[in-house]
Amino acid sequence: MKEILDLSVETNMVTAPRTVSPLDLASAVMDLMAKENIGSIVVVENNRPVGIVTGRDMLLRVLKLEKNIELTVVRDVMSEPLVTIEAGRTIADALEMMQRNNIRRLVVTRKGALVGLITERGLLEIAHSHYMMRGRLKVVDDHRIHRIRVAYVSTYPPRECGIATYTKHLVDATIAYCTRAVMSPVGVAMNDRGGYYDYETRVKSQIDVDDIQSYEKAAQYINASDVDVVNLQHEYGIFGGEWGEYVIELLKRIEKPVVTTLHTVLEVPVPDARRVLEGVLEYSDFVVVMAKAGMGILERVYGCGGDKIKHIPHGCPNVHHIETAMTKRSFGLQDRVVLSTFGLLSSGKGIEYVIDALPQIVKEFPEILYLIIGETHPEIRKREGETYRQFLLNLVESLGLKKNVRFVNRFLPENELISYLQATDIYVIPYPNREQISSGTLSYALSTGKAIVTTPFLHAEEVISNGAALKCEFKDPNSISECVNTLLNDKQIHQRLSRRAYEYSRTMIWPNVAMSYVNLFYHALGL
């Protein structure tokens, strides 16, 4: 419990909550609550919060007393004195203040200025994750938690790979937030062809992608070690053999429980892809999917039992939801409307459809700048060089868009990537294929509170259905331009989508994801 209660209230607060002034009319408050489906609005005077108006206030102090809603001002309705909490205080402090004052919401301030709102519902979400984990933790006779050691089989930094980045965040989060449950982790790193890396010290064993004997040696190392459970990060392309079939030789030989995270689940697999994934399923005690749609595919297409499949969302960083203007200045973009897409570049990303959509967007908004962030995928670069990037550059030039498109051709450190996202007005995901079951870029865009325009690939379908993203059609520049122009022309829709994206991401932040994984590791061990 301590790991959660010691987090700052900023972890789960709603940033940029809706505000009104004390002299605004109660009718305006009611309109806003109805339009945006919100239960409270902060009252601000001279940039300082002075009260809060809730749905209960409106019912008891206006409607019940039969006041004229067109003549009643907010000052006569709001709850005061206002109870606030400083952003640096802990969730434990927030819970105590809510209980002491018998309230469900706390206005969060920094040096007296409004920075957010923390709600009972938000605290319940993080508490739910904690208690799920607590129920699985085994307490030994001396009343300490039975700590386990996990081996992670995956690519690792400094290798430039999305799976490597994901694994680093997962490992770091389990160390940071589950210290009473896990011991120092063990890394088993997947090397690409000809790739040798200066790994951090937690990497104790390495597998050369095309050397079948190195898979066997890695299994021997794991079996002889004090590792309790193995987490395998599975993506076809990081393992050797046809469709990465060498991973089965590794799994066959591991004598410890295995929890496998599936980054790709094909709904219409070719025979070799089916064979390999069926082997992974056979030799795994549990498998994790990041989108709930993956659970149905595994049961329906691969015949995997439902009890074996667990849903844990793709993790995301816990960052502040800030106005884009604050970050745009640091990039010299204060006069631009910024669209962006990030990730390792390859033809499967569909960037060309956004470029094709730009003329219709630029016609209405000539200040548009589309940022294409990320270098070409290293494996693609080995096989094809910069063919795809050059294709995109040629397309930009042929459409006369050189002033409206900028390539950031680097693998960015996380803090710089987040800054670019915070400077983004609309984040676009134009994936051309439906079968994408997980997307780190989608998770990051949600975590920074972006208004998102995305094609309905499997992971995105769930986000769209929850009102946290706007759907555009596959391979359809006209659909993309229509969605972007709609958001830019209607600030209310844009702001509502942005807030919903941020709120949706709160259950996906790394502390929650780490606890879910540790909970599953204990379950795999029968604890």
Predicted regions and their residues:
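Acidic donor-binding loop of glycosyltransferase active sites
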Residues: 404, 419-436, 450
